């Protein structure tokens, strides 16, 4: 294998879990001496135009044949079957989560994403996923043989334990882009019924990826009378994000589905108690003793979980201790990068 050509659509600097994973692979490989480079693809994926597809074809076909193509699933899952077939024998597909499981799609759109991604994955020599949950999902619903799928869980860096706010008001923190799948509307609906309790919520995440969702969330916050208690912080730099984690008393993740849930391990690394859903891999990412878990999309269950933890500082401390204990066993990025590089080496033409 001469090198890994890592094809990634859109802006690699965007503050999402998927792009963070991709950035970290490239950074680790540089330190490890693994020959790898980033091949930018158009930003129109997963709904590319004909121009996007033509540009993608030119970019990929211009790569040396002895390099292995590692293609982010945001693009590869949307490739027409004819394009995927033409790359057979050279591709490792990186699936963060199946495209058809994104919330907010019509049934027709979701079915088309599933059909196209299933067809493309048939031609991938190997598939890398970020969780055992996604591996099982690809085997069950996308006809991908389990022996072709390798799990490379995201790593996490060691961090200082969160000190918390130190006040009587419980500081809630949620991290993730404002997109339908993150379930922030469910969180606000749950908190609406807890106005008599002492809490404040900060949501950190890009607010420009789904403008309609952001507008609806802002309107919901205003309509529920929670504007003074809910802060939409937008995307933050690393120092500001670290400060938000350090000041938090409880981490909340109301996602409807997660292919892994990298923010959960970031919370664990800082010893934060967690309230999360069982959507996708989230139920496995956070240990049961560190996280109170509720079904995704269930306003009543989320409200009950919030009330329980807001009312019981002792339980929050116990779950915080469990999270801090789990932090020492979390995977590191060097191991993640090694696993993916080994998969690519086996596929090298």
Residue ranges and their predicted role:
Residues 163-182, 188-193, 202-204:
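Conserved donor-binding/catalytic core segment of Leloir-type glycosyltransferases
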Residues 235-236, 243-248:
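Short alpha-helical donor nucleotide-sugar binding micro-motif in glycosyltransferases
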Residues 214-236:
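Nucleotide-activated donor-binding/catalytic signature segment of Leloir-type glycosyltransferases, i.e.
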Residues 256:
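Aromatic "clamp/platform" in nucleotide-sugar-dependent glycosyltransferases that forms part
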Residues 264, 273-276:
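Short hydrophobic beta-strand element within catalytic cores of glycosyltransferases
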Residues 108-127:
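Membrane-proximal helix-turn-helix segments that form the acceptor-binding/catalytic region
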Residues 133, 155:
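Carbohydrate-associated surface elements
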Residues 288, 292-300, 307-314:
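Conserved acidic donor-binding segment of nucleotide-sugar-dependent glycosyltransferases
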